[in-house]
Amino acid sequence: MRKNIGRPKSFDTDVALEKAMYYFWEHGYESAGLSDLLQVMGIKKSSFYQTFESKELLFRKSLELYTQNSVLYFNTQKEMHGAKGALIELMNLLLKEVQDTGHTKGCLVMNSGGECYAKFGHLTSLVKEKFKDFQKLFMSFIIEGQKLGDITNTTDAFVLVTVYQSMINGASAMVRAGAGEKEIEVLVTAVKKLLE
């Protein structure tokens, strides 16, 4: 009887990838050592290379998963709160995270942008692609809100989304630098004003 080549997978690939995504989100690409990833994912080195091939490919898959999950979340929020409400809810979510934990993980795409641009140029194109994906998504929400009359600000949608993303990502950076609940509340108010 012929033996099967290789061992069958004894782990859930999707679960392992999700765990890796959260680890990259918390620690960044460079700081995520292979041994740490293996421990977090609950798999052996042979299984890692057989399934994910390399740390870089795992990171790429993690960034894809993060984007997919985020888009699904934002679209769900839009269904619940409308386009304008979904954009405001993202800022409220950041505020709640600060209230509950005193810090924020920020956005994996934006966190990766600074890190990859400086040291891992070969990953920069992927990060830029994901940034554009979020930009297009948020801009579509703004355009929809303007068409429905929920957003009466008639400023060009590209300008609004640029300011909006700057506020969201700036808020995360401020929290990591020591800003607290009061500062984020100011930005929540500013976002609401922007999207009036």
Language model: regions and residue ranges:
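N-terminal intrinsically disordered/low-complexity leader segments
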Residues: 1-11
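C-terminal peripheral helix-coil segments that are non-catalytic and often amphipathic
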Residues: 1-3, 91-96, 132, 136-144, ...
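Generic hydrophobic, amphipathic alpha-helix propensity
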Residues: 12-21, 37, 62-66, 70, ...
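Helix-turn-helix
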Residues: 15, 23-57, 61
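Hydrophobic alpha-helical connector segments
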Residues: 61, 75-105, 157-164
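Amphipathic alpha-helical packing segments from all-alpha helical-bundle domains
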Residues: 85, 121-147, 159, 189
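Amphipathic alpha-helical segments used for helix-helix packing
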Residues: 100-122
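Hydrophobic alpha-helical segments that form the core
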Residues: 105, 110, 153-174, 190-194
